[in-house]
Amino acid sequence: MKKTALTYLLLGGILMSSGCDLVDPTEVTNPNLTEEAILNTNNPMTPWVAGVKRQLALTVNAHVTFLEIGSDNYENVQTFYNQNLDNLTIRPQDADINGFQFQLGRLREMADYGLTVVKNADPLTTADQEAELNFYKAYSYLLSGEYFSFLPVTAGGEAVEWRSILGMAVETFRLAESSSNTQISAAASLGIARANYRLGNKAEAVQAANSAISKAPNLVYYAQFDQAQGPVNTMQTALYDRGNFDDLQVLPRMDFLDPKYYFRGASQASPVAIFKIEEAHLILAEAAISDNNLNSAKSVMTDIVNLVGSRERSTFNNNQQDRTQLNPGSRPNNSDVQVRFSPGAPLIEGLVLDRKSGNVTVPTISGTSVSVADVDALNDLDDALETLYLMRQEIFIAEGRRLADMGIKLVISEVEYLANPNIDAGSPGTSPVIPPFIDSIKDELDAFDYDAAAGICTIRHNINRILVENKTSELVLPFH
C-alpha cells in the first residue's frame, strides 16, 4: 500500500510538471557518453578500476564520521554532523544511515559491473584488475555484515542475514588474494581474518591473520583522498579543517591520539587506513586469551606495542582546537591533567596534550597508551582482555571501527524499504541491535567528570571493562 501510494505521488508530480515549459533532462543525450561508446574506448578497465577506487573513498566518508560519533570515542558538540548517533538513536530515517547503505551498494555494484560488463568489453583486462575489483566488492560485503543485522546485497533484493554476508565477504576476498600486488593480497587475507573474527571462526581467523603477517608485516592499506579535486577526507574536516568549531571532542583518555587526520597541504588530504597489520596481531592475541594462554597473549601484545611504537607520528599546529570553547573549564586541555578510566581506577598521566603551547605530535597510523611494562604486569586473563580491547580502541580510533566492537548494528534505511518490494517496515533488520549493557548507559557513553582545579578527569564508564564483563554475550567478543 505504501509503495503504491508513493508511486501515485511521484506520477502526479510528473504529470503536473509536464505542462510547464521546462527542459526534461532525460531527453538530453550526449552520443559520446553512452555506455556503448565508453566500453568501446581503448582499455576501459583501467579508468573503471580508478573510478571504483574513488568510490571506496566515498564509502569510507559515508560511515567513518557518524560511526565514530555513535561510539564512546567522540562526542559531537555542534550541529553540523549527525545529531542522533551520539545517544545511539538509530532510526531508519537517518540520512547518514541511508547514505552509508547507498555507498555500500554503489561500491558493490560498481565492482560487479567491472567484473562482468567491463571485463567482457576489454580484452586487455588483467588478473590483477579483477583481483582489485573483487577486493572492493568484498570490502562492501565486510562493512555490510559488520554494521547491519540484515541488508540486501543485490539491487531490490531480499535482506540477507549478517553472518551470510560476512561469508560472502570471505569468499570474495579469497578471489582478491591472488593479486600480485602484495598490499592488496595481504589486505584481502586480513579481510578474511576480520570477517572470520566477527563470525567467531577462531581457527580460520588465526590462519588468515598469520597469512597476512607473512605477506606484509607492516601492512597499511589506505583509502586515499584528494584535498584539491575531491573527495576530501570527511573525518579530517570534522577533526581539523573546521577549525575552532571543535565539532567532535575526543574522550579525554584518548586525547593524545587526536586528531589522527590533519591538513597536509592544498593538494594532499590525510588518508584513512582500512586495513593494517596491527589487526592481525590483535586477532592472534585474543585467540590466545580465549585459549587461556596468557603467556602467548602477552607475547603477541608486546609485539603489538612495539609495532605501534614504530608507526609514523606527525607534528603540526593544533592550537585552533579549543577543548573548552563552548563551556570553559569543562574539558581537560593541558598535559598536567590526570585521567581515570572509571571511578576508583588509578590516575594516569600523559593522556592529554597541550594544544595552546606549540605544535603537537600525534600518531597518524596507530597509537596506544599501553606500554611493554603494562603488558608484562598482566597476570589475569580478563585484565589482559580488557587491555587488549583498550588497544583495539586506541589503534582503530577515527577509523569507524569501534561500534562493531560494542556489538551495535544499524538498521535498513527507510529509503530502501520504501523502494524495495522485498522489505517492509517490520522486516528483520529494520530495528537496531544494541546490547542491553550498552543500551542502559547509552546517554553516558562519552560522559566524564572533570575537576579542573585538581586536574583530575574521571571517565564515568569503562566500556572495555563492561565488554569483558559481558564477554559471554553473543553480541560482543566473538571468541568468547
What are these regions (language model features)?
Residues 93-99, 144-172, 203-207:
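Short coil/linker segments at helix-helix boundaries
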Residues 1-20:
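Sec-dependent bacterial lipoprotein signal peptides
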Residues 108-111, 166, 173, 209-210, ...:
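Inward-facing hydrophobic residues that define packing positions of alpha-helical scaffold repeats
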